[in-house]
Amino acid sequence: MHLFFLTAVAFVITSVSVDASVAKDPRGHAPNRTEVDTVNASSSTRLLRKNSTVDLVGEERAPSIVENIKALVKSSAVTPAKLQQWLDERLPAGLVFKNMNLDEPNIFSLLHEPNFAKWVQYADDLSAKSSHKESSVISTLTSLHGDKVVYDTIQAAKLYPQLSELALKLEKDQIRFWIATRKDPSVVFEALNLNWAGISIFPKPEFSAWLKYVDDVNARHPKEAPLSIIPTLKQRFSRGDEAGTDVLLKLIANGKATTEAKTVANKVESALFDFWLNSRETPDKVMDAFKYGTTTQAFLGSPRWKEWERYLSAYNARYPEKKATAIETLTRKYGDAQLLDTLIGASSKGETKTLAAKLQAQQFDRWMNLKESPLDVYNRLRSSYGDTAFFNEPQLNVWVSYMNVFVDKNPSKVDKMFLELGDTFGDMRLFRVLGEAKKFPNLESTATKLQMEKASTLFASGKSPEGIFKVLALDNVGDDILSNTLFHKWLAYLQKFNKEHPNNQESWFDMLRISYQPFGVERIIETGRKNPLTRLMAEKVENAYHNYWLDIKMEPKTAFRSLHLDESGEKLLADPKFNTWVQYLKTFNDRYPNEKTTVIDGLRDNSHDIALLRMFSAAKNDPSTEKLATDLQSALILKWQDAKKTPEELKRVFVGVPAADEMLDRYIKLLAVASSTP
């Protein structure tokens, strides 16, 4: 029985081999007997080593099928009738692909095979009969070679005239196949060779094609969870120390700034927002993405802040039950104290000043909605600032601003509020608060009244004016202290104290000087001069300041710089402070006759002669300083004479200085007169 079976198999193989040889003979006639016998003998020998049979149409083959039988079956001629038979039987395109001997490794060579076009038509006809319309051509090729290889092959084939029509068809089929199977965007991204596009990716046509692909998939499958481009882009651009989202945001910003990429950049940005919204990303988390790598203050002044606000609005519209505000988000992330510092810093810069004021008002509204009194806010903030720092500017000003808002909403609570503050703070801190509160309309009246009541108690104590000066917070009033009522009351108290304590005199100027330092005293004088009511007091402060310089024996050349006259340039002689300095120089000479100096010496200590020549020349054009300039020119010429300067030496020094000619002429004449005098 076994021998009979082998004989039967050999007979079948012989028949198939003959048919195959006839079909494949390019000359179109049957092979001779010798050729047939050779094929039969070879095939029979190999088949005797196998133990199984094969289905010639390729529907189901066991792993032990004889390789030679497979080759012979594949090499059989595929006639239109055979294709029709397979089509009627709805034989899968993948099996027909193998039956037609098309499953060779080189896919590009495959496109040149005549049978390939026949197979493509077969696959299309089969798809037309099927309820699933996706291309079995692309499905088969992809299963063998992968998406990217198939795509690259199609793109290469488009360059050949004889293949371009077929390639264009396959290109469309591949896209339809991807859409039908909801191919992962990252796979298509790689297939389109976008992994190597770099930061110039947005203007590329392949990128636009990829965006359209994702849109088409979502339109084709509305009941499925929508695909997003964002995970692919984030993964692609996640490199180094920068998060993928941050790089993507930079690409979007750069793209929106160019004409060629603006549309694509807006589309990607919209997709990013949709991705966040669909993922229920909170405004807090999205803020981290927008703020990545920068300070909060810089973030507030950047375009990304506006984009974040736009996301906040979109989030609130999508999830009204989880509605968030900018100030709540910032407070959750940074806390009241850190946020307060950030807003203070932002308020000092032009580009963020308006936004800082808006957020500050929202912070106040939030505290009001929480029904927090100024004392409640103080108790919360003090843990971050400490007792000392809290009472310094500008934190104190912001907190007192909230007091003003609180009283505006609760006018009947103003007295109680100040009473609570008085019980909480010592006199020194309370006076600091009261001094700030007087600047606000809702607080001014009560603060002034309480301030005077407390001050009267202090003045009645007979304590040192120096100590009371600090308790009254007069060391923190600022440049306009000379117009401060409490300061004048303190001056009156000091005069009374000095009369009552002749052996323990205290100086009002020392308190100003120590508290405000030199630059502060100068600003006090300048501010006081501008107000008719305080002008005399400003002059009194200035005189006291100069007397202090004399007491410490400050040289006129140093006083020159202390008055900032070295910054006046060619207009020095017209500067009012110049006369002040000249008067100081005279007073200094009177007090210290052994260290007398002159105006020209003081000028030369602070300027080169070249600069002085230019200054004198400019001053002579002003009638108010003409005589002074001429006198100083003469004084300078005498200095040259004392130093035995020669005209030739001076000419070399002043070469190119227009104002030097007149001075040199005068000097030469002086030397001539001196030489003729016995």
UniProtKB/Swiss-Prot annotation:
The RxLR-dEER motif acts to carry the protein into the host cell cytoplasm through binding to cell surface phosphatidylinositol-3-phosphate. A motif (RxLR-dEER) lies at residues 46-61. Keywords: Host cytoplasm, Secreted, Signal, Virulence. GO terms for cellular component: extracellular region; host cell cytoplasm. Belongs to the RxLR effector family. Induction: Expression is induced during host plant infection. It comes from Phytophthora infestans (strain T30-4). It is found in: Secreted; Host cytoplasm. It comes from the Eukaryota. Effector that enhances P.infestans colonization of Nicotiana benthamiana leaves. This is RxLR effector protein PITG_16705.
